[in-house]
């Protein structure tokens, strides 16, 4: 049997790093748009004895015995996901968003088929056809981008490319785009060329669940998402679809056995918890505040002379262009990190710098809103960001801002204990 010994006693080296990360999360302001803080209930499910159980297959059709309780858990997660997003089909087994996306490709395409997706350089995701990713290596990837005048998706270009290249599938969705996506326009374009429409709503799933952002679920053929980010659950994936028996069968077999073996039952349980949390009345107020906070920060930074791609935001994030300031994203990331403000460097459209340097940073408000920040706090925060950037990383300015950050973090703890 196991020795009755704690992690800190058994592996102090590892425990020390975990404790340091705990302290970092409490003392730093998190503005990475893809990060959030999940609830103790989600973490309790994720850390449960379910991690011991193997359960290849689906509820009622397993390849292992002893699955009577995990069947109940997985079915609960499926039913909640369908109810939350108004879907006819849900697969809760994907380990992550990228695995969910790869299963969709496997289900709907053959190697070499043409895919039309958003360019990574313009706000798309690796799995939307980037050359370094399976989606750009296995398939013939054509990329669309933003209108250089507006900083918004150029739907006319999407339609032109679709007519020219006749893709088998069009991918809509993003990892760094701050406006409302016109899902129906994508649907119309897909129908015009006889393509599947696949939406990756990983970044806005929480907003969609709360009715704060338009839902693509009954418009697209297939929709995927992560379950963290705005959804505020465990780091995992989810596939949703409207009713189509043929596509549902293809998706089921693409996930298992096509793309994965045994599901992570502890993660599925944590997803079930986060879906239930997203059905609570206060969840909509949270998501509304996420958007208000992003808009408030954008307003302050614009007033301080900074450029935001597309001129503002309708969701939880925005891209701050630093080209005018002659500051790199890498520099801004480091300076703000020294002030206990965590962001990520990010390319801006037509960025002259490399992806390892970039000319911008991406800012998102899901985590600070979970923490309890309102518009007053994020306006102060945006001013502090401008102070650090204006100073070009001056040590005294960074020290002053860091002290303010530590004070506000103490006032708004992530986890009370």
From Swiss-Prot:
Q: Name one GO biological process term.
A: glycine biosynthetic process from serine
Gene Ontology molecular functions: glycine hydroxymethyltransferase activity; pyridoxal phosphate binding
Obligatory cofactor(s): pyridoxal 5'-phosphate
Site (Plays an important role in substrate specificity) found at 228
Query: Which pathway does it take part in?
Result: One-carbon metabolism; tetrahydrofolate interconversion; Amino-acid biosynthesis; glycine biosynthesis; glycine from L-serine: step 1/1
The record lists the catalysed reaction(s) as: (6R)-5,10-methylene-5,6,7,8-tetrahydrofolate + glycine + H2O = (6S)-5,6,7,8-tetrahydrofolate + L-serine
Q: What is its main location?
A: cytoplasm
User: Which key words are in the record?
Assistant: Amino-acid biosynthesis, Cytoplasm, One-carbon metabolism, Pyridoxal phosphate, Transferase
Q: How far does the signal peptide extend, from start to end residue?
A: none
- Got any disulfides in this one, which pairs? none
- Mind telling me which PANTHER family this protein's record contains? SERINE HYDROXYMETHYLTRANSFERASE (PTHR11680:SF50)
Which family, according to the similarity comment? Answer: Belongs to the SHMT family.
- HAMAP family found in the cross-reference section: SHMT
Q: What is this protein called?
A: Serine hydroxymethyltransferase
Species source reads Acinetobacter baylyi (strain ATCC 33305 / BD413 / ADP1)
Instruction: Identify the coding gene.
Output: glyA
